[in-house]
């Protein structure tokens, strides 16, 4: 069993103002995405975007992540809590961001930005998709520091006892997701996007990869207490939301390569 590193959720304080690690991780993820995406267009011989457009796109996407993620959490995972306390939407430092809601927010943001610039939607999506895992990696580390979204009881050597989760060692499911949805998916998408794939293929691979990884980790992650398992004694809301992602990812990949061969 490993010892959980009880890190103070507050990274730094300025008098009454407290900067939480959870929010700081989102800032780090967004900043890293901006830096790497900007460097890509600067090094490209035929960039689809200018550096200034990258800055605008990342800004649009960041707004979509925060607004969509918070609304998605309220609607998908804690609707009764939202009805009881609507102000919870603004307390981001407490945790509670739903990836699937954030994804919807980013899709809307990309559509709006592409339309304003006269750029096709999947050109925007294929450009941004390889950088999304950076934010996922940072966000899951933020979950780990917060000591939330832990996994089921486990006797594996790397199991941990989390605060507020009793005295039972558990899967550090946040780190599983950080590794799979963050690091592994980042490497796969960066490699794949540099092999001149057809339009829609990068977006499709992102949806498929994230959906499969998240669906798998949900088997060892405890569901949100207010929802529990929704069917069969194991199916979670996260898995239900991943199923259309997996299906749509396969459809996009098949359509992308069918169009290329045609």
Curated annotation (Swiss-Prot):
A single GO molecular function term of this UniProt record: phosphatidylglycerol-prolipoprotein diacylglyceryl transferase activity
Pathway where this protein functions: Protein modification; lipoprotein biosynthesis (diacylglyceryl transfer)
Binding site for a 1,2-diacyl-sn-glycero-3-phospho-(1'-sn-glycerol): 140
Membrane-crossing residue ranges in chain numbering: 17-37, 57-77, 92-112, 200-220, 234-254
Enzymatic class: transferase
Pfam families: LGT (PF01790)
Membrane topology: Multi-pass membrane protein
Keyword tags: Cell inner membrane, Cell membrane, Membrane, Transferase, Transmembrane, Transmembrane helix
A biological process from GO: lipoprotein biosynthetic process
Record localization: Cell inner membrane
Entry's EC annotation: 2.5.1.145
Gene Ontology, cellular component aspect: plasma membrane
Similarity comment: Belongs to the Lgt family.
Known function: Catalyzes the transfer of the diacylglyceryl group from phosphatidylglycerol to the sulfhydryl group of the N-terminal cysteine of a prolipoprotein, the first step in the formation of mature lipoproteins.
Name listed for the protein in its UniProt record: Phosphatidylglycerol--prolipoprotein diacylglyceryl transferase
Source organism of this protein record: Methylococcus capsulatus (strain ATCC 33009 / NCIMB 11132 / Bath)
Underlying gene: lgt
């Amino acid at each position: 069993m490993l010892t959980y590193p009880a890190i103070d959720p507050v990274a730094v304080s300025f008098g009454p103002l407290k900067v939480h690690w959870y929010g700081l991780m989102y800032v780090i993820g967004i900043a890293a995405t901006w830096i790497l995406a900007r460097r890509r267009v600067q090094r490209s011989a035929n960039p689809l975007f200018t550096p200034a457009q990258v800055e605008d796109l990342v800004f649009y996407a960041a707004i979509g992540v925060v607004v969509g993620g918070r609304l998605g959490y309220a609607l998908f995972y804690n609707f009764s809590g939202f009805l009881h306390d609507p102000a919870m939407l603004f307390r981001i430092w407490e945790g509670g961001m739903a990836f699937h809601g954030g994804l919807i927010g980013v899709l809307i943001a990309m559509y709006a930005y592409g339309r304003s610039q006269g750029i096709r939607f999947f050109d925007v999506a294929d450009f941004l998709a390889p950088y999304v895992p950076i934010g996922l990696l940072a966000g899951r580390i933020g979950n780990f520091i917060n000591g939330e979204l832990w996994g089921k009881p486990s006797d594996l050597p790397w199991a941990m006892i989390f605060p507020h989760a009793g005295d039972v060692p558990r899967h550090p499911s946040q780190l599983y997701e950080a590794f799979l949805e963050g690091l592994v998916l980042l490497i796969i998408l960066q490699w794949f996007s540099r092999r001149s794939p057809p339009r829609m293929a990068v977006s499709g691979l992102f949806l498929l990869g994230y959906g499969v990884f998240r669906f798998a980790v949900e088997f060892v992650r405890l569901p949100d207490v207010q929802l529990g398992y929704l069917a069969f004694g194991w199916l979670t809301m996260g898995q239900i939301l991943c199923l259309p992602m997996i299906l749509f990812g396969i459809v996009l990949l098949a359509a992308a390569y069918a169009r290329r061969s045609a």
